Amino acid sequence: MLVWWGATALSFVVLVASTWSLVAARGRVVEPHQLPANAPTTLIVLGAKAADGEPGTYLRNRLDVAAELYRAGRVDRIVNSGNDSDDAGREVRTMRAYLEAAGVPAVAIVDDPIGMNTAATCRRSAEEFGVRRALIVTQGFHVGRAVGLCRAEGIDVTGVIAPCDGCTGLSLVRNYFREALLSRPRAMFNAFGVGQICQRKGRRGRPVR
């Protein structure tokens, strides 16, 4: 009986969290070519796996979208947010190097080296960098949660879907399951102020509009 009740409770939380993610992102998620004319010009790039100075598949696709939007004149400032520790592969340093190699000038890039997770990225973008309107780029399975968390921090945000060229089917399935069972419920609780995710505070960065 306890197992049944536990499974029922888990299913309920997963359903509510998925609904929260869908509602939070409704009308706020687009493909790169669908950006409206009045879209924000600040773009937040969420960090992901990096190793040996090279972005992993998920991160590379996000950065390619960021570089494309900058070259097209759709954004003028890019906030790279991730875990820049040695253990995490120096995500932010790798992101900057990749974007600069793709033609994005150094002055257009803002580094957030302690965006340890999506919630921390959204909170720091608002509190440390003064972001009020922004685009945020990530893969489709992640974008609803990212939009919901940034909206909870008061950012008028639009999610931009990055492709997943080169992603394996197994990794996609794993990420979709993790998103549904773990990440969305945790994000929903965080967005409503339950179980706030602890994070370190860095130095206050330049305001980004």
List the predicted regions and their residue ranges.
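N-terminal membrane-anchoring alpha-helices
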Residues: M1-N38, Q199-R209
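Electropositive, surface-exposed helix/loop patches at the edges of structured domains
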Residues: G6, I114-C122, H142-C150, F192-R209
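Residue-level signal for alpha-helical transmembrane segments in multi-pass membrane proteins
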Residues: V14-S21, I44, P185-F192
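A structural signal for short, hydrophobic/glycine-enriched beta-strand patches
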Residues: W20-F177
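A general structural signal for short secondary-structure boundary/capping elements
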Residues: D86-E91, T158, A180-A187, R203-V208
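A transmembrane-helix-recognition feature enriched in membrane-embedded lipid enzymes
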Residues: G169-Q199
